[in-house]
């Protein structure tokens, strides 16, 4: 039996080399709104776009690191595209000034993974709850899952079991009232 090693989201070895270069960058809603209020929405979008591009470049470095380290699977960070699915901010990928370069870099991530035989998948954050009794939570979860699927598509991963998206249902006994047992 062959054992395939996998890496989840972040390479501590790369971060030890250069924490600033190899760390994912996020952005809070507060920071985005502060930028909008102080410098305008265009500047906030520009900063967000820059951070997303950085995250995608870091992902490319991590996939290449996996290849050099004999790691056969990489699970994408769910933080590649911060705030993009926040409905209150109404951000479209098309308005990101770096979207073309982001898409090209994501394609390169996929090309590198294929070249070195590295499988990839994703694991959306725990706040995504498909089994919620709250319709708004389910709607937001579907939006997040669609975004994650779009990223997998932009990378060029197959739409099958070889590029899994790990989704937790978050079942609790109270849900017995909601779901019919099949």
Predicted regions and their residues:
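Alpha/beta catalytic barrel-like cores
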Residues: 1-118, 128-131, 136-139, 154-157
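Conserved, mostly hydrophobic/aromatic
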Residues: 123
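Eukaryote-skewed repeat-based solenoidal scaffolds used as protein-protein interaction platforms
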Residues: 139, 145-182
């Amino acid at each position: 039996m062959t054992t395939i090693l996998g890496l989840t989201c972040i390479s501590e070895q790369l971060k030890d080399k250069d924490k600033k270069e190899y760390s994912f960058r996020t952005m809070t809603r507060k920071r985005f709104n502060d930028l909008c209020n102080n410098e305008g929405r265009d500047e906030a979008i520009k900063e967000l776009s820059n951070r997303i591009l950085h995250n995608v470049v870091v992902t490319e470095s991590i996939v290449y690191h996996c290849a050099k380290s004999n790691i056969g699977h990489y699970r994408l960070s769910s933080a590649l595209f911060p705030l993009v699915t926040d409905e209150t901010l109404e951000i479209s990928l098309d308005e990101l000034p770096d979207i073309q370069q982001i898409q090209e870099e994501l394609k390169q991530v996929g090309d590198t993974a294929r070249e070195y035989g590295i499988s990839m998948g994703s694991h959306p954050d725990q706040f995504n709850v498909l089994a919620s009794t709250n319709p708004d939570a389910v709607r937001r979860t579907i939006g997040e899952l669609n975004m994650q699927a779009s990223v997998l598509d932009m990378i060029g991963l197959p739409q099958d079991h070889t590029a899994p998206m790990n989704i937790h249902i978050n079942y609790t006994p109270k849900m017995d009232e909601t779901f019919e047992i099949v």
